[in-house]
From Swiss-Prot:
An annotated GO BP: glutamyl-tRNA aminoacylation
Record's protein name: Glutamate--tRNA ligase
GO molecular function: ATP binding; glutamate-tRNA ligase activity; tRNA binding; zinc ion binding
Binding site for ATP: 246
HAMAP family: Glu_tRNA_synth_type1 (MF_00022)
EC number: 6.1.1.17
Gene3D superfamilies: 1.10.10.350, Glutamate-tRNA synthetase, class I, anticodon-binding domain 1, HUPs
Organism in which the protein naturally occurs: Burkholderia mallei (strain ATCC 23344)
Keyword Nucleotidyltransferase: no
Compartments, as annotated in UniProt: Cytoplasm
Catalytic activity: tRNA(Glu) + L-glutamate + ATP = L-glutamyl-tRNA(Glu) + AMP + diphosphate
InterPro entries: aa-tRNA-synth_I_cd-bd (IPR045462), aa-tRNA-synth_I_codon-bd_sub2 (IPR020751), aa-tRNA-synth_I_CS (IPR001412), aa_tRNA-synth_I_cd-bd_sf (IPR008925), Glu-tRNA-ligase_bac/mito (IPR004527), Glu-tRNA-synth_I_codon-bd_sub1 (IPR020752), Glu/Gln-tRNA-synth (IPR000924), Glu/Gln-tRNA-synth_Ib_cat-dom (IPR020058)
Length: 469
């Protein structure tokens, strides 16, 4: 009988979480949802020097923002130390591990000799018990590490869902340290116990872990566990072709929120960064879950493309509810010095979003492009001299007069504009440009009738009148 699917995301809370990291949560989440399985969150916090509470918060916040909900956890490895020690004791009883007294200095010297002889540097099994072998006398006052008895012959073979068949000779693997002198278990051991206890059936993770896999499989088999399906994801490259990292300028997951990206756009982009469904570029969360499979995971490194993300975000902004965008835009307005009271006194923010969103790649950009609605106009003197000429002033005055009594609809504003253009034999830009400048303070706006409608009759008429006085 097939086991129910159980996947996991097991980040180390040692700082920064970027798109490359969070992708290792997205794919196991999607696979668990697709297979009606269980998605487990496990925090691998055994690196006490580098693990921080702030990093844990960043992981949880990033997952929540993208909607990557977990069914179990978060489990913390530091809270499972008693369990690891229990398994270590069982392994000692079964002779699966042995104490090794080789010092760091002795190990370094051994590796230097091996390198000088052109050999692969590795532990040579000095303290490994074998029938008929006489072990050295344990040095006084030295607490040993515990090493796992790796098989000496044969191979570790697994069918990787991304890489295909992988075979590693056991002769390539030395006896791994699985407990330090103070009894603290090491990373590769903790991972195996966790995956075994948590019944993980599919391990979907970055291929920087692939070298750990044969060691973990051997420990898992020694403990009588069933080997999960492994899928090792190729790395994510930045736009310069380097591995994505903070050092190479990667932005944190929440940095995208703070830059005005929508979570559905980032999730859609991230899904395509190493997986595909035919030619589909745009798809909902529900479609992604329905379509996701391990067979279509990419086998080559995926390269981040900021322009592609902007294109996707623009699509989702255009699809988004204007009231939602208005709420998302408020912090960006605040950063520009436009507070809630100012917004309340100005044009309807929801209407502004509806008008301005089509041209924007981010919510931040919508806010930046919409400040004209909430600030007094300060048109450039050169632009005024160019557009507000004596020749056009009579037409401006007539247009202002017409707007005092016109019905305040987009259609009526457009009709008034058209009538004045006809009466004064002007082309649209000759009147629209000075109106934009005097009302909005800029010549760069969407259609003039829509902009004036949002500003409102009183503001439009008073600004035109003041400029013509």
């Amino acid at each position: 009988m097939t086991r129910p699917v159980r996947t996991r995301f097991a980040p180390s809370p040692t700082g920064f979480i970027h798109l490359g990291n969070i992708r290792s949560a997205l794919y196991p989440w999607a696979f668990a949802r697709k297979m009606k399985g269980t998605f487990v969150l496990r925090i691998e916090d055994t690196d006490l020097e580098r693990s921080t509470e702030a990093s844990v918060d960043a992981i949880l916040e990033g997952m929540a923002w993208l909607g990557l909900d977990y069914d179990e956890g978060p489990y913390y490895q530091m809270q499972r130390m008693d369990r690891y020690r229990e398994v270590l004791a069982q392994m000692l009883e079964k002779d699966l591990v042995y104490p090794c007294y080789m010092s760091t200095e002795e190990l370094d010297a051994l590796r230097e000799r091996q390198r000088a002889a052109g050999e692969k540097p590795r532990y040579d099994g000095t303290w490994r018990p074998e029938p008929g072998k006489v072990l050295p006398e344990p040095p006084a006052g030295v607490t040993p590490v515990l090493r796992f008895r790796n098989p000496l012959t044969g191979s570790v073979v697994w069918d990787d869902a991304v890489k295909g068949r992988v075979e590693i000779s056991n002769e390539e693997l030395d006896d791994l340290v699985i407990a330090r002198p103070d009894g603290t278990p090491t990373y590769n051991f903790c991972v195996v116990v966790d995956d075994l206890d948590m019944g993980i059936t599919h391990v979907i993770r970055g291929d920087d872990h692939v070298n750990n896999t044969p060691r973990q499989i051997n420990i898992l088999r020694a403990l009588g566990g069933e080997v999960p399906v492994y899928a090792h994801l190729p790395t994510v490259l930045n736009e310069q072709g380097e591995k994505m990292s903070k050092r190479h300028g990667a932005m944190s997951v929440m940095g995208y929120r703070d830059a005005g990206y929508l979570p559905e756009a980032v999730l859609n982009y991230l899904a395509r960064l190493g997986w595909s469904h035919g030619d589909a570029e745009i798809f909902s969360r529900e479609q992604f879950v329905e379509w996701f499979d391990l067979e279509h995971l990419g086998k080559s490194p995926a390269q981040y493309d900021h322009n592609k993300l902007n294109w996707l975000n623009n699509h989702y902004i255009k699809e988004a509810d204007d009231a939602r965008l208005a709420e998302l835009a408020k912090p960006f307005f605040a950063a520009l010095g436009i507070d809630a009271d100012t917004i309340a006194r100005g044009p309807d923010l929801v209407g502004v979003m509806g008008l301005m969103k089509d041209r924007a790649s981010t919510v931040k950009e919508i806010a930046e492009n919409s400040t004209m609605f909430y600030r007094s106009p300060a048109p450039d003197a050169q632009a005024l001299a160019q557009h507000v000429t004596d020749a056009v002033r009579p037409a401006l005055a007539e247009f202002a007069a017409a707007l005092k009594t016109a019905e305040w609809t987009k259609e009526a504003i457009a009709a008034a504009l058209k009538a004045v253009l006809g009466a004064h034999k002007l082309k649209m830009p000759q009147l629209a440009m000075p109106v934009r400048l005097l009302v909005a303070g800029t010549t760069h706006t969407p259609s003039i009738d829509a902009v004036l409608l949002l500003f409102g009759r009183d503001v439009v008429v008073s600004r035109l009148a003041a400029a013509l006085a």
